[in-house]
Amino acid sequence: MVFWTELTNQLNRVTLNFPDEREKEYRDFYFVRSYKTTRVAYLILALLYAFFGYLDSVVARQYFDLFIIIRVIVVITLLFVFFYSYLNKFRINWQTLIFITYFLGAVGIILMLVMLPEVVVYSSGLILVFLAGSVLIKLRFLAFSIASWLVIVIYVIAGILWKVDYSIVLSNVFFFAGAIIIGMIAAYRTEVFNRDNFNLYLQIAKKNVQIEQANKNLEDKVEERTKLLNFRNKELKEEVKRRALIEKELITA
């Protein structure tokens, strides 16, 4: 798998930003290509986050009320982003909203995980959140990376505060870190690929403009030559008429 191409050597290796005005153009391009996917993803994730509440009733009966409150808060936030995506303002702060809701969804699972550290389903749930953040909701690479590692830090702090067994915290951190690294690779490659396509799109658009300009210039030249030929043809006809008239006058004389 190629992570860096000759076409994208000019990108910042960490942020993946273009060094010039193309960055703003790319962000507009990326939004137009992504917002519908993000909208559908948030609806699906809201349903899934709510549906897993049934699992709480099975494995976390003693904390069921609290876990449901957590899920309701997260689901309402996800649905807010879903409906907000229909407004024009969504274009301005959509990545910020995605970052916040992704982080909030992960923290919600962390609270459940530290209260029931022996129940492995919640650690699996957090890995699902990492998966959604890296490939589904269209969060950019740098934002995904920052949010995900912050989640790990919060999990470790929460584990200490809730006095979770050290071995459980350590083993979970290893699995979470592995999931994040895999997600970072996927997010990095996806963003490089998208920026590659955008760069290619700009080059094709530039070539099309050049071709259109060349065609216009050719049309102008053809039109100019056509006018010249018509003018010469008119002159020739007038010359023929003039000579015919002179010849007729000579014959008459």
What is the meaning of each model-derived region?
Residues 2-22:
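Short, charged cytosolic
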Residues 31-47, 63-72, 136-147, 169-174:
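Alpha-helical transmembrane segments and their helix-membrane boundary motifs
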Residues 41-133, 150-156:
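Hydrophobic transmembrane alpha-helices and their membrane-interface boundaries in multi-pass
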Residues 81-82, 109-114, 133-143, 157-166, ...:
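Juxtamembrane membrane-interface segments at transmembrane alpha-helix termini
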Residues 87-93, 116-121, 143-148, 152, ...:
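Transmembrane alpha-helices and their extracellular/periplasmic helix-loop junctions
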Residues 159-208:
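Alpha-helical transmembrane segments and their immediate juxtamembrane flanks
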Residues 192, 199-253:
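Amphipathic alpha-helical coiled-coil "transmission" helices that mediate dimerization
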